[in-house]
Amino acid sequence: MENVLKNDWGPLLAPEFEKEYYRKLADFLKEEYSTHVVYPKKEDIFNALEYTSYENTKVVILGQDPYHGPNQAHGLSFSVQPGIKTPPSLLNMYKELRDEYGYDIPNNGYLVKWAEQGVLLLNTVLTVRQGEANSHKGKGWEHFTDRVIELLNEREKPVIFILWGRHAQAKKKLITNTKHHIIESVHPSPLSARRGFFGSKPYSKVNTILANMGEREIDWEIPNL
């Protein structure tokens, strides 16, 4: 898992790939990929950073670890590959979007359109063993993705961090630069969405902040495939 990042994340994150924790993580992943089914595919691990460069990041939506079912994960938090049923949390995200903007719920969960507009869809852990949620927790990815958040925190241009649920909100301690914005609520999971996610209007809050900054707003509508 060497540094394959081709955009501005490459030099920014280069020191991480040389650190002891990352070498141990790379050894662990080499073993995991050769002995188990692991998601996403190796070439998709860093997709969040590939689709959304450092300079172009306007918004961060922080997830936990990748979906662990076949053909779901492709390196973007909450997103699934085309042709795969929309998972429950993402369906609730779409319901909130419908309530905010009147958009129809799309027939897919492929969020590349968001990523291409500057929405960094970052999981805190970037790989998982099939059928075993959190199986790669504590193996080193957290150090790596914390560094991603720290680098964004160091940026002069403001970033909007969307933190849903306690796991994401635990990363608030890394966001110390008062230029940045934090939008938080409970997680869109069916277990918690009715306790404050529905009606929280995260998408229009983002666009209000962007408009006030003179930045292009995010077109949140996901097209049918």
Curated annotation (Swiss-Prot):
GO terms for biological process: base-excision repair, AP site formation via deaminated base removal. Its EC number is 3.2.2.27. PROSITE patterns: U_DNA_GLYCOSYLASE. The keyword DNA damage applies. It is found in: Cytoplasm. Pfam families: UDG. GO terms for cellular component: cytoplasm. It catalyses: Hydrolyzes single-stranded DNA or mismatched double-stranded DNA and polynucleotides, releasing free uracil. The active site is at D65 (proton acceptor). One of its GO terms (molecular function) is uracil DNA N-glycosylase activity. Keywords: Cytoplasm, DNA damage, DNA repair, Hydrolase. It comes from the Bacteria. NCBIfam families: PRK05254.1-1, PRK05254.1-2, PRK05254.1-4, PRK05254.1-5, ung. Excises uracil residues from the DNA which can arise as a result of misincorporation of dUMP residues by DNA polymerase or due to deamination of cytosine. Belongs to the uracil-DNA glycosylase (UDG) superfamily. UNG family. This is Uracil-DNA glycosylase. It comes from Bacillus cereus (strain AH187).
